[in-house]
């Protein structure tokens, strides 16, 4: 089962990706992890990626596609894989198709921007332990304090409203066009496309995914 997850940052993809991996026994492929692993392994592609990154440039789509092809040929991808964060653009999706990387399901996590802002901006973190709270949805027992240690909670830089809104604008400009692209692919019978209501509770979203994926 080969799956692509689409949706804005904060739409709940990460939580559900974990569930899909465990339930269907497929690995999650993140381009960031893949690039780091390739550089570490010193493979031909890894060396190319390292040279580009050392020069402070963005890795080309061609190189990322080559890495994806190499990664999905590995044993743990025999039953499929889960792609999150790639493709991000229509040229990348086209390049994937040309490289013969077919996808069974494209799942779009649909959550209104304002709810995403609410979800992310309300996060509070206990940095030493990694415990995460939310002022509205999962508040600590004492406001601003970690439940276990009583230490101060902080807000991550990435969780500040200005940053979140900037990322949402980027998503709508760059990645949202993929929704139309994959809807057309589904109409042509090349993949299955499903919209998932990401505003529901985690368990409800999980149940919806089980219905879609079987």
Curated annotation (Swiss-Prot):
InterPro entries: Adenyl_kin_sub, Adenylat/UMP-CMP_kin, Adenylat_kinase_CS, Adenylate_kinase_lid-dom, P-loop_NTPase
Catalyzed reactions: AMP + ATP = 2 ADP
One Pfam family hit: ADK_lid
Annotated metabolic or biological route of this protein: Purine metabolism; AMP biosynthesis via salvage pathway; AMP from ADP: step 1/1
Keywords: Acetylation, ATP-binding, Cytoplasm, Kinase, Nucleotide biosynthesis, Nucleotide-binding, Transferase
N6-acetyllysine: residues carrying this PTM: 192
Domain of life of the native organism: Bacteria
Localization (cell): Cytoplasm
Enzyme Commission no: 2.7.4.3
Residues annotated as binding ATP: 10-15, 123, 132-133, 200
GO molecular function: adenylate kinase activity; ATP binding
GO cellular component: cytoplasm
Main localisation: cytoplasm
Similarity remark: Belongs to the adenylate kinase family.
Domain comment as written in the entry: Consists of three domains, a large central CORE domain and two small peripheral domains, NMPbind and LID, which undergo movements during catalysis. The LID domain closes over the site of phosphoryl transfer upon ATP binding. Assembling and dissambling the active center during each catalytic cycle provides an effective means to prevent ATP hydrolysis.
Subunit description: Monomer.
Free-text function comment from the UniProt entry: Catalyzes the reversible transfer of the terminal phosphate group between ATP and AMP. Plays an important role in cellular energy homeostasis and in adenine nucleotide metabolism.
Protein name according to UniProt: Adenylate kinase
Species of origin: Shigella flexneri
Gene that encodes the chain: adk
């Amino acid at each position: 089962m080969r799956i692509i997850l689409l949706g804005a940052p904060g739409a709940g993809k990460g939580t559900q990706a974990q569930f899909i991996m465990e339930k269907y026994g497929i690995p999650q492929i993140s381009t960031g992890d893949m690039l780091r692993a390739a550089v570490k392994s010193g493979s031909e592609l890894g060396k190319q990626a390292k040279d580009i990154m050392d020069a402070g440039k963005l890795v080309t789509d061609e190189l990322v596609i080559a890495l994806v092809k190499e990664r999905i040929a590995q044993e743990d991808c025999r039953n499929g894989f889960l792609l999150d964060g790639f493709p991000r653009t229509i040229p990348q999706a086209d390049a994937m198709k040309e490289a013969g990387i077919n996808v069974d399901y494209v799942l779009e996590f649909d959550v209104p921007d304002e709810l995403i802002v609410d979800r992310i901006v309300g996060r509070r973190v206990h940095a030493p332990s990694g415990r995460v709270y939310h002022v509205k949805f999962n508040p600590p027992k004492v406001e601003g304090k970690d439940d276990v240690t009583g230490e101060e909670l902080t807000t991550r830089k990435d969780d500040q409203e200005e940053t979140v809104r900037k990322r949402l604008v980027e998503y709508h400009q760059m990645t949202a066009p993929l929704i139309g692209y994959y809807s057309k692919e589904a109409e042509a019978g090349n993949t299955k496309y499903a919209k998932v209501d990401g505003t529901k509770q985690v368990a409800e979203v999980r149940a919806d995914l089980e219905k879609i994926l079987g």
